[in-house]
């Protein structure tokens, strides 16, 4: 029997049912994990296209396979669009993820054993910025800068001192859990002082940069890496940007053949579509609502009824799409708070806070993000309602209070249907 044209529902109802269940879960609750977003239907259609069938090792116009005339057009569109979106001279759109984009950049510009300097994972950095068990900590001599114990901000004087002490070949500016903007110009000045390459990992805030509501690192960094989902709202994947032709040549070689073989042209098509969407006025409006929503949430969680329960907002607020909730003085730990919000259909993730006394699987914090709700169309009033629901859930004194909150969450979510074209009957 030829199954080539069988539908998923007909051939594999088990997987189809699980996908449908996930769709209902995403639609009926509030997705507030800061690294998650909703990919537009057009992006998912591009990713689910016949381009998944095509091998295309190499780059547009320089492939090792025949029949690449259409995938060449797809990849060139993605390159041109992302360069225009971020004002970069060169772009590589082939990395399968942000982690592989970072790995390829290091492979291109460093030798094994070279020193790198990045934000400590425990203070908001990322695995690929030098964690010991990650490739970045195994292949390179990883050193770290931290946030200040007084205000939990990156102390640029301390970064400069660490750079002078360790003399890194690469300085990494970027984060996975830090609620403020970074001073890219100062990072570049420090990098120049010690003759280091500055790599900015803007995976979390790329969408804000594209919309013009966050400073761009592109004019300052030697290299900028990013994911294409998160605030950018595209498919899961990575990109690398730069303005130096010599660096661009090294990066292209490091991606292919250095790190990867055949590019995922169906994902690159989805990236191209996402880049086009990110250039639209509606996208800029969405990113502003994303920022405003995070600030509304931070403001609500600093009110007396929350603060008196030992719950605090790290740094007192946010400049980006996420809020870090500090539970070190609260009755709840991070795991308990995550579970409490899950009980009312609000999905967040527990997250370590700087100087966290609890183990990483428990933590003393929450990371709460607004990109997915902004993508669904949530207004300022909606974000105020969400902030009230989160505050009520975190300060609830018994489980009986959670049922009515869950009903309110479901009513709010129902006002914004998700992917109606995908619902199965």
Swiss-Prot record:
Pathway in which the depicted protein is active: One-carbon metabolism; tetrahydrofolate interconversion; Amino-acid biosynthesis; glycine biosynthesis; glycine from L-serine: step 1/1
Major site of localization recorded for this protein: cytoplasm
Subcellular location: Cytoplasm
pH dependence: Optimum pH is about 7.8. Is completely inactive at pH below 4.0 and above 10.0.
Cofactor note: Binds 1 pyridoxal phosphate per subunit.
Enzyme class label: transferase
Molecular function terms, GO-annotated: glycine hydroxymethyltransferase activity; protein homodimerization activity; pyridoxal phosphate binding
UniProt-annotated site: Plays an important role in substrate specificity, residues: 229
Signal sequence region: none
Highest taxon above the source species: Bacteria
Keywords: Amino-acid biosynthesis, Cytoplasm, One-carbon metabolism, Pyridoxal phosphate, Transferase
Residues bound to (6S)-5,6,7,8-tetrahydrofolate: 121, 125-127
Reactions accelerated catalytically: (6R)-5,10-methylene-5,6,7,8-tetrahydrofolate + glycine + H2O = (6S)-5,6,7,8-tetrahydrofolate + L-serine
Cytoplasm in keyword set: yes
Entry-annotated residues carrying N6-(pyridoxal phosphate)lysine: 230
Gene Ontology cellular-component annotations: cytoplasm; cytosol; plasma membrane
Function: Catalyzes the reversible interconversion of serine and glycine with tetrahydrofolate (THF) serving as the one-carbon carrier. This reaction serves as the major source of one-carbon groups required for the biosynthesis of purines, thymidylate, methionine, and other important biomolecules. Also exhibits THF-independent aldolase activity toward beta-hydroxyamino acids, producing glycine and aldehydes, via a retro-aldol mechanism. Thus, is able to catalyze the cleavage of L-allo-threonine.
Annotated HAMAP family: SHMT
Subunit structure and binding partners: Homodimer.
This protein's name: Serine hydroxymethyltransferase 2
Species of origin: Mycobacterium tuberculosis (strain ATCC 25618 / H37Rv)
Gene that this polypeptide is encoded by: glyA2
